[in-house]
Amino acid sequence: MSDSGGFDSHPHVALIPSAGMGHLTPFLRLAASLVQHHCRVTLITTYPTVSLAETQHVSHFLSAYPQVTEKRFHLLPFDPNSANATDPFLLRWEAIRRSAHLLAPLLSPPLSALITDVTLISAVLPVTINLHLPNYVLFTASAKMFSLTASFPAIVASKSTSSGSVEFDDDFIEIPGLPPIPLSSVPPAVMDSKSLFATSFLENGNSFVKSNGVLINSFDALEADTLVALNGRRVVAGLPPVYAVGPLLPCEFEKRDDPSTSLILKWLDDQPEGSVVYVSFGSRLALSMEQTKELGDGLLSSGCRFLWVVKGKIVDKEDEESLKNVLGHELTEKIKDQGLVVKNWVDQDKVLSHRAVGGFVSHGGWNSLVEAARHGVPLLVWPHFGDQKINAEAVERAGLGMWVRSWGWGTELRAKGDEIGLKIKDLMANDFLREQAKRIEEEARKAIGVGGSSERTFKELIDKWKCNNNTH
């Protein structure tokens, strides 16, 4: 609170995240930033969560920020068989969307604004429009991916045939004001017009122009050209302001010490500076046994020290296999003298900030890429699904890292151990990438510092929300 008054003189912002750590994490970090900027914050939650990690994360957040109000949103019964999807996270998005019309009682005045997850915006907008409540979107991927999402409905309309199908004649998708995006980089689920993902993708894409603004966890040095094009209204006519508020910083509770983190940090302390390649594919990706073996062989053949985080199942509640079962006995024995392999939660921020870490092999999840940028760690991006190829292109364009297009993605992953090893060697020995990464790290520090671009953006938003206090 400021000296000039109590809570009522400050904006009151509600946030409604969606399922998955990739969506929840930036929401909680944004909420923490809003608290630090003297906003009142309400967090709208749904239970049970899909993963145990989500439940724990929300619990730790609310304990760390007791001034945040939690409101639980009770969803209508939902039959997964009624949706054309099997992904548990996608099904939860749909369950929230189908219950969105019941949100109004949780949005009772006085609220200055609601910040909605991108996956929910088309379902939530009618509620906020009816309440005359400003609705902002937190887009949880790159600005480059947002440019595709916002322009895709118009692109589909221009490619539709008389039979209702969509045909793309070229190998690229043209986006006004920006370089074209290879068709091969577009998430395959978007191209299946009958899929649940494609339907909601189009509906959400059409809704941005009706929102009051879009917040993105990015900053100028990472995606300058894309942000300029978006705010110049060159991508989509009538698009509201796009606010680059990144890099969003980890909450204090994320820095908690536990036996696993202590073990990892102790091991890193014993390694030479810049010698370790960190390998992690996020909270949702579990490699096949075959691809896990190829990656292990690649790490060994690279000759580099490594810290490798593995997953056995997509949903952590179902992941009961031991590390030895995931890796196999032979690979487990081979790697123990060259690296450390863990199969549990890792404090990624502490890992990336450690002096021993000199490179990061990532799946291309946007939160991970922004964390690498903030710590100046060069990237080898290995996209697997969703927005990850487009995120990889953004990283490559910024000079922060590289990716190998021939490695495939989804069910077509085809990277071999020797290729992986060579690319990791290249990553760890690439002076140009290292210099670029350090430059971007410095720009990230400036963006969130006093008078920086992201700090100014937060103040601009808060000033807007203060004005809303007078009318809501």
UniProtKB/Swiss-Prot annotation:
Pfam families: UDPGT. It comes from the Eukaryota. Residues 283-284 are annotated as: UDP. Coiled coil: none annotated. One of its GO terms (molecular function) is UDP-glucosyltransferase activity. Expressed at low levels in leaves, flowers and immature leaves. The active site is at H23, D117. Optimum temperature is 45 degrees Celsius. Belongs to the UDP-glycosyltransferase family. This is UDP-glycosyltransferase 708G2. It comes from Citrus unshiu. The lineage of its organism: Eukaryota, Viridiplantae, Streptophyta, Embryophyta, Tracheophyta. The gene is UGT708G2.
